[in-house]
Amino acid sequence: MEIDLNADLGEGCGSDEALLDLVTSANIACGWHAGGANAMRDCVRWAVQKGVAIGAHPSFHDPENFGRKEMQLPAGDIYAGVLYQLGALSAIAQAEGGRIAHVKPHGALYNQAARDPMIADAVVSAIHDFDPSLAVFGLANSVFVAAARQAGLAAVEEVFADRGYRADGSLVPRSEPGALIDDEDAVLARTLDMVRDRQVRAVSGEWVPLNAQTVCLHGDGPHALAFARRIREALEKAGVEVVAPGVLQAGEGI
C-alpha cells in the first residue's frame, strides 16, 4: 500500500525546509495569499535538492485573510488569476532546474472549487491550458476532482487527518465546532482509517467512504513538525510506503 504526503509551503511558517524531509509533494504558495518571490525560490530550490514533487498552490488574491475568505468572482477572473500564479512559480522552478508537477488550490478557492462547478471548471481550464500534463490535488470525491478528470487531467484525491468531515464528504468550515482536531492520537488513528480502510468518521457519526491518495500535513503551529514526523512514522510502521503519487513518479517535477 502506498500514500503520498503533501504540505503547503512558502506561507511563512518557518519549517518549510525541514518539512521537505517528511513529505513527497510540496504545494508552494504563489504570492497571492502568502509568500512571495524569495519564498517561492527557496522552497523550489529545497524541493529540487530533496527530490520532492513541486506543486503550485494558487489562491484568491487575498493576503489580508490568508486566502480563506470566500469570493464570488467571474470565471474569467478566476481563470486569469490561476494562470498568472502558475506562470510565476513555473518560471522560478525552471530557473532552479525543476518544473511544476501538480496544482493544489488554496483555502477558499480550494473549498469553493470542491463544490461549485463554475469555479472548478475555471481552475481546471487554467491548469489544462497552461500545461495538460499537470496533475491536480483536490478534496476526495469532490466536484473539482470530477471536473479535472472530465478535462483529461490526472487527479489525486486528498484527505486531511486533522480536519472534521461532514457526512457528504466535505470539510467542516473552520468557523464551526469540530472543524479542527487537536488530539494527536485521534489524528493518527484517523490517518490510518483513511489510508488503510478508505473511510473517515463524520462529525455526525457516519462513516464516509473516500479514496485517500495524498494526505495533507499542516506545517503551522509550534509542534507541527514533530507531529508530521509522527504521522509518517505511524504510516511506515503500519506497512504503508510513503511515495509521490504514480502520476508524479514518471519524472514530472522531481
Swiss-Prot record:
Keywords: ATP-binding, Hydrolase, Nucleotide-binding
Molecular function in Gene Ontology: 5-oxoprolinase (ATP-hydrolyzing) activity; ATP binding
Signal peptide location: none
CDD domains named among the record's database cross-references: LamB_YcsF_YbgL_like (cd10800)
Enzyme Commission number, as recorded: 3.5.2.9
Quaternary structure, from the entry: Forms a complex composed of PxpA, PxpB and PxpC.
Family of this protein: Belongs to the LamB/PxpA family.
Family annotation (Pfam families): LamB_YcsF
Gene source species: Burkholderia multivorans (strain ATCC 17616 / 249)
Protein name: 5-oxoprolinase subunit A
Gene3D superfamilies the record matches: Glycoside hydrolase/deacetylase
Keyword Nucleotide-binding: yes
GO biological process: carbohydrate metabolic process
Known catalytic reactions: 5-oxo-L-proline + ATP + 2 H2O = L-glutamate + ADP + phosphate + H(+)
Stated role: Catalyzes the cleavage of 5-oxoproline to form L-glutamate coupled to the hydrolysis of ATP to ADP and inorganic phosphate.
Alphabetized PANTHER family for the sequence: 5-OXOPROLINASE SUBUNIT A, UNCHARACTERIZED PROTEIN YBGL-RELATED
Top-level class of the enzyme under EC nomenclature: hydrolase
